[in-house]
């Protein structure tokens, strides 16, 4: 077996970086790997949706080089003053490349990597549309993902006309400049500025970054599980989820005090309930978008008069109470004056006034997490006192993508660079708040926004705001792609809003959608429902006896799977593998490289949810031998298998050699 150790060597007119037989980087005068340029960014933000353009003045290939040991000096034969120094360090199955421009004017870097025709590329953070990235370009900039995310649809066009809010296949709350290859190597860029990976040209992968210096890290392994593990170890692991979070459904209701009355309908129907999530615990602000929240992070006694006593009563029944928070404070909130007086908000560029951001018919200040005192205040005074001390066991830690690029930060950093780092700072504030109260591993927060390094702080991703439909780029199926792609770059656990969220322009839930999403939710680590942005316009789980009975059944299945899920999560902590895995992670064959509509749930379950409307079943790829249908026990052969899929029985298979085969047999007997 060839060695995986990286090797750097000079060639006749350039150099190469290799791992085994694979060439990861090749530079020559005829085919330069590096370019420098000079550009000016043009950025416009409307409610978290960004229009970003580059006024590029110059772009030159660095076609000349001198190699001395692990140091390379590069320059352009056309403009010699455009030059850079590259340092390459190799250490076994890892390597590091540092490039620094020697020209003060240069602020754009392009790096070209060779790519074999047979290679598949994955990663990029949490991608919603495509698991296999080949053939497309993916910018890395945290933002709202948009509504519709498909330029061919009427909904996307309507949303684009209203604040550039339609999105596209690449827009995501959680981008990350990290990619993996089926050739068993990975590349990570430490650049937090705007960057992009372009895979649209056959045979080459081009990474562009708006900076004059950056570091690339290379990883190599004999197999994909080991490669994913290396990335997980690189970015760090958060605290494991507590048992309560994986043992039944977290019911999302936001009807004030009536939420507790409605919860009893779920309990009476037999639902296994682990939590009640009331994001409106802070009060309501009605907008044209729908029912939104009042962003003052404290209990709203008018909406929930008896909340302390009700939380205590739930706790006695083994049910946790969860709430909502985000890193902004409305300028008409009492807490805003407190933060402003202490200097805890980001400021305008031209004066010391708080920079206000439009969030859609209300304005907010941005808590400045580059200020350590502001971080401590938010972690202790806000999350600690108002939430954890009050009795909350968890919360949605929303947003993090809206940092404007035209504000002034406490530490003097460039907002263009701080923008992508903001979700990581936000995650750390939440994790620190929990740690300060001694509740690490007991309290849980979940986030949609992310960037490189969020893995170490956030215990639970949430796939953001899907439309309440089956559409290809913004519907139920995107949560599968989100979980699989984010898992490849070191995020161990993902989940989603059961039922979807965004309902606009007549797009409302159907009973079929709710049934299918409930089925999917039961086979994810955390099963949490959401009423959506317009609850009164949409079907809810308790809108009909049939929906409620179905939810109760599937929540019971979710609770019964808890021992297996705990095993999977423990395995993730030990071996750095995500709970939901692409088929190719354990069955490394080209035919599985683009499969994103089914997943391995741990190593022993294969889940293939129905994510299309008006179908009664689906074909499922069975990878390898030794599988059986969970509901019938019928053995399955490798290849394509047809599954009937009535509501309540999504296509699921289990390994016949699993140590949990008894649990799966009990599930079949009880629910089959």
Residue ranges and their predicted role:
Residues 2-245, 250-258, 263-268, 451, ...:
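Catalytic and substrate-binding clefts that recognize carbohydrates or anionic sugar/phosphate headgroups
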Residues 27, 34, 280-281, 289-359, ...:
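Active-site-proximal helices and loops of the catalytic beta/alpha 8
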Residues 99, 178, 266, 314, ...:
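Conserved, mostly hydrophobic/aromatic
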Residues 187, 194-197, 253-258, 282-287, ...:
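Flexible loop/turn segments at secondary-structure boundaries
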Residues 240-411:
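Aromatic-lined carbohydrate-binding/catalytic grooves of carbohydrate-active enzymes
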Residues 251, 274-281, 300, 322-326, ...:
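Generic beta-strand/beta-sheet core signal
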Residues 346-392, 427-468, 529-550:
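Alpha-amylase-like alpha-glycosidases and glucanotransferases acting on alpha-linked glucans and related
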Residues 432-443, 449-463, 482, 486-496, ...:
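Catalytic core of carbohydrate-active enzymes
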